[in-house]
């Protein structure tokens, strides 16, 4: 049976990795992705609403997104929201859809994105290590209070370290995958 402390640590580490993965999906890579628009909201009858809840977003060709709102009166609001965002893209509105064309990124832009990816992944690693630190601190406290033996403490510390190594490795794989995606031409 797995110790409850280890279960909780693993769950927290897994959630940290998942959060980093989600954050990386939103990072621009030069390749169009509907996830880039998830954070952009428009005013929909007085309520800030994500674009993906009022329109269909499709990837077309190699470097463009087509945003087709369910109500045509939202076209200009979507266009303005994208222009106001930090995506650095210029939407075109043809009366039916909003088209986002992604220009080929320069090598400098790609390097900047890789650097940003590395920062995001590093935050994930720090989170995983902080979880390890908290668990080890808790184990030492339990040993001090006589709840577990020193042998159990050492065994559990080793297992926590193994979990940490596993999730750090997962984060490294996420980075490598994203870096490869960014550097593709």
From Swiss-Prot:
Subcellular localization:
Cytoplasm
Does Cytoplasm appear among the keywords? yes
Question: One GO biological process from the UniProt record?
Answer: translational termination
Give yes or no: UniProt keyword Cytoplasm: yes
Keywords of the record, alphabetical order, are: Cytoplasm, Protein biosynthesis
Domain of life where this protein originates? Bacteria
**Chief localization:** cytoplasm
Q: What one GO molecular function would you report for this record?
A: ribosomal large subunit binding
Q: Which GO terms describe its cellular component?
A: cytoplasm
**Disulphide bonds in the chain:** none
Q: Name one Pfam family in it.
A: RRF
Q: Which family does it belong to?
A: Belongs to the RRF family.
Q: What does this protein do?
A: Responsible for the release of ribosomes from messenger RNA at the termination of protein biosynthesis. May increase the efficiency of translation by recycling ribosomes from one round of translation to another.
Q: Mind telling me which HAMAP family this protein's record contains?
A: RRF
Protein name as it appears in the record: Ribosome-recycling factor
Biological classification of the source: Bacteria, Thermotogati, Thermotogota, Thermotogae, Thermotogales
């Amino acid at each position: 049976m797995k110790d409850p402390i280890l279960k909780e640590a693993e769950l927290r580490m897994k959630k940290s990795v998942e959060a980093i993965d989600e954050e990386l999906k939103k990072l621009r890579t030069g390749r169009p992705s509907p996830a880039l628009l998830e954070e952009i909201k428009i005013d929909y009858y007085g309520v800030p609403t994500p674009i993906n809840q009022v329109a269909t977003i499709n990837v077309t060709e190699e470097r463009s997104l087509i945003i087709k709102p369910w109500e045509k009166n939202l076209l200009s609001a979507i266009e303005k929201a994208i222009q106001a965002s930090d995506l650095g893209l210029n939407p075109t509105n043809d009366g039916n859809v909003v088209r986002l064309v992604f220009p080929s990124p320069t090598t400098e832009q790609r390097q900047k994105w890789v650097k940003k990816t590395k920062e995001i992944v590093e935050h994930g690693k720090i989170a995983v290590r902080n979880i390890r630190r908290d668990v080890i601190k808790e184990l030492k406290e339990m040993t001090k209070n006589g709840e577990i033996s020193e042998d159990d403490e050492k065994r559990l510390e080793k297992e926590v370290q193994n979990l940490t190594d596993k999730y750090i490795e997962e984060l490294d794989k996420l980075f490598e995958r994203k870096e490869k995606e960014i550097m593709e031409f």
